Amino acid sequence: MGLLLLETFGPIEWILLTVWILAISAPIIYSLKNKTPVALGISVALLLGYIVQYSWVVMRNYQIDVNFVWADFMLIPTRIDSPTWLHTLASAGFLHSQSDVTHVLGNVLVIALVGIPLEQRLGTNRFIAVYILGLLGGSI
């Protein structure tokens, strides 16, 4: 159902997408490897991912021809019935509006202030399970 825009990406789009994937995955992987709170890693991942997303806006403002990189990772309910788009159930949780920073800052504050103590009480594995359920539940 629908064409993936990834097929039309040039070098700039691939670089931006790669940096975004690294920005959202590296802090979480780091926290798992170093036994630091995963909630903190998620908070950092959300902030770094947003910074990379916002760099797309900056490029567009300087008339750099960049396709909308995030379209294949946004959750659009009408296309979720196709296996091609199942990845959006998870990726949408790390995408935020480039025009309103308050949403991502609110997410970061809640995850940092509530998530870290919750992770300490539940344990890392249970916290990850709760977070993934919330991530998927928020996408349904």
Q: Where would I find each of the regions flagged by the language model?
A:
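Short, strongly hydrophobic alpha-helical membrane anchors
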Residues: 1-11
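Select subsegments of transmembrane alpha-helices in polytopic membrane proteins
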Residues: 11-14, 128
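Short, aromatic-rich membrane-interface segments at the entry and exit
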Residues: 13-16, 34-40
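N-terminal TM1-TM2 helical hairpin plus the immediately adjacent luminal interfacial "cap"
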Residues: 38-140
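Membrane-interface helix caps and helix-loop-helix hairpins in membrane proteins
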Residues: 30-33, 97-98
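N-terminal signal-anchor/start-transfer transmembrane helix
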Residues: 15-31
